[in-house]
Every structure is written in structure tokens, then in C-alpha cells.
Amino acid sequence: MMNRLLVFLMLGAAFMLVVSAIDQDANDINKRGVPCLCDSDGPSVRGNTLSGIIWLAGCPSGWHNCKKHGPTIGWCCKQ
């Protein structure tokens, strides 16, 4: 009985560790946003820095649209 309890507690602790790590990754993405390729970055994503951030509802104050044609969803904005 005691061994089953210990196994249950260890599995619960491992599950909580995984869930907290996934949550931290999601928070980092929310703060950073999804990078996109501005026109000033060059023609290809290979070897170029992605200096823009995709915003779904238009560029916020202090940012400008840095790509003439799309992404398909949202705007590629740069400070």
C-alpha cells in the first residue's frame, strides 16, 4: 500500500514539473510574440534575423508595419 502511494506521489510531482515547464514556455511566447521577416531583413529567412513581431490586431503605438505584403494573418511590426 505504501509503495503505491509513493509511486502516485512521484508521478504527480513529475506531472506538475512538466505542466509548469509548458506554462513557462507559453508565457515566454506571449511576452515575445511570434517573429516575422521584415522587408529590411532580406529576401530569405535563412541566416537572417527575424526582426519583426506578428500582431493580430494591427501594429501597436510606437510600432510600424515593416512588410509590404502580408503575413496572411496579422501584421509584421517593428519598433
Swiss-Prot record:
<comment type="function">
    <text>Binds specifically to voltage-gated sodium channels (Nav) (site 3), thereby delaying their inactivation during signal transduction. Has a strong effect on crustaceans and insects and a weaker effect on mammals. It strongly inhibits D.melanogaster sodium channel (DmNav1). It weakly inhibits the brain sodium channel Nav1.2/SCN2A. It strongly affects the heart sodium channels (Nav1.5/SCN5A).</text>
</comment>
<keyword id="KW-0165">Cleavage on pair of basic residues</keyword>
<feature type="disulfide bond">
    <location>
        <begin position="59"/>
        <end position="77"/>
    </location>
</feature>
<keyword id="KW-0964">Secreted</keyword>
<keyword id="KW-0166">Nematocyst</keyword>
<dbReference type="GO" id="GO:0090729">
    <property type="term" value="F:toxin activity"/>
</dbReference>
<dbReference type="InterPro" id="IPR023355">
    <property type="entry name" value="Myo_ane_neurotoxin_sf"/>
</dbReference>
<keyword id="KW-0800">Toxin</keyword>
<dbReference type="GO" id="GO:0042151">
    <property type="term" value="C:nematocyst"/>
</dbReference>
<keyword id="KW-1015">Disulfide bond</keyword>
<keyword id="KW-0738">Voltage-gated sodium channel impairing toxin</keyword>
<protein>
    <recommendedName>
        <fullName>Delta-actitoxin-Avd1c 4</fullName>
    </recommendedName>
</protein>
<feature type="disulfide bond">
    <location>
        <begin position="36"/>
        <end position="76"/>
    </location>
</feature>
<feature type="propeptide">
    <location>
        <begin position="22"/>
        <end position="30"/>
    </location>
</feature>
<dbReference type="Pfam" id="PF00706">
    <property type="entry name" value="Toxin_4"/>
</dbReference>
<keyword id="KW-0732">Signal</keyword>
<keyword id="KW-0528">Neurotoxin</keyword>
<feature type="disulfide bond">
    <location>
        <begin position="38"/>
        <end position="66"/>
    </location>
</feature>
<dbReference type="GO" id="GO:0005576">
    <property type="term" value="C:extracellular region"/>
</dbReference>
<keyword id="KW-0872">Ion channel impairing toxin</keyword>
<dbReference type="GO" id="GO:0017080">
    <property type="term" value="F:sodium channel regulator activity"/>
</dbReference>
<comment type="similarity">
    <text>Belongs to the sea anemone sodium channel inhibitory toxin family. Type I subfamily.</text>
</comment>
<feature type="signal peptide">
    <location>
        <begin position="1"/>
        <end position="21"/>
    </location>
</feature>
